[in-house]
Amino acid sequence: MIGRHGVDWWRAARRAGLRAARIAVAAATPTAAARFGVDPDVWQRELVRGSVVSPDRLARTAAPLVRRLLRARQVRIRHPNGTDLTVELLRAPPVVEDGRVDRADRRAGRLWTQIPTGVVAVPLVPGVAQGIWESNRPTYNRFADPPVTLGARFTFRRGRLYEYSFDRGGASFAREYARGGRGRESPGALTFGLNPAISRAPEVAEVAAGTVGLLLGGNRSLGGRNPSRFAYLTTLAEANVELDGLPFLEDGRAVPGARPGDRRRAKVPNE
């Protein structure tokens, strides 16, 4: 896998101006499917469908989200499962993964993409996150034991992870977190999925349209300030998201640009 090459390899790749793509379907093997407990044919078909969504379509979907995120400061994420988390966006351009590695990506040191893709990522201000985040999608990591975690529940106080629990598979997170080092406890970024053909495929959860992801740990590659090498991403589908009190996503679907007078129409779970 490209992502597991060493520092020297990446240094040489940058000097050479290399661009690369990780083709996810190549890793959707029967062995991996058995480890994850999924049907390999279903997994592969979903990845293929997601891979043929064009970069232009993903870029068009991303554009209105990026425009609103650029103007926003505070984000509140809610869901009937108990999620109620408030974070603050760093003053940095959102990163759009649309399947192309362009000049801006290379200037920022991002040399590769994944196929399928489709995600907008925004770094967060440290020391601000407050509330509860509960994932409702599995997190897959073929190199972990166990390789699947479910029901990640994180409680944040004053920008730091205060406590955590999992419905299943939490031992693998606990081991990674214990050796994560400084910065591991800080939420690093939010992600917003764009790809309409991805729903439940392992290892690409963050690109599924209608999902919000929370990255715990380092965010330097996204323009953030946290240099931690620890990174753990969990995802939440069908969330309600507000930007500065205005509706941004309702049940995971984008809300057209709202005006200040629309503030009261922001959907509250269980209304």
Model-derived regions: residue spans:
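Active-site bordering "gate/hinge" segments
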Residues: 1-130, 258-271
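Short, glycine-/Ser/Thr-/acidic-enriched flexible segments
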Residues: 29, 82, 92, 138-140, ...
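Dual-mode signal for accessory low-complexity, basic/Gly-rich regions
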Residues: 147-148, 163-226, 241
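Internal helix-turn-beta structural module
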Residues: 200-270
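Short helix/loop capping segments that flank catalytic or ligand/cofactor-binding pockets
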Residues: 32-35, 85-88, 95-98, 142-144, ...
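Short polybasic amphipathic segments
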Residues: 74-77, 152, 162-164, 238-247
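Long, well-ordered mid-to-C-terminal structural blocks that present hydrophobic/aromatic surfaces
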Residues: 125-175
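A short, polar/proline- and glycine-enriched secondary-structure boundary/capping micro-motif
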Residues: 98, 172-177, 253-255, 260-262
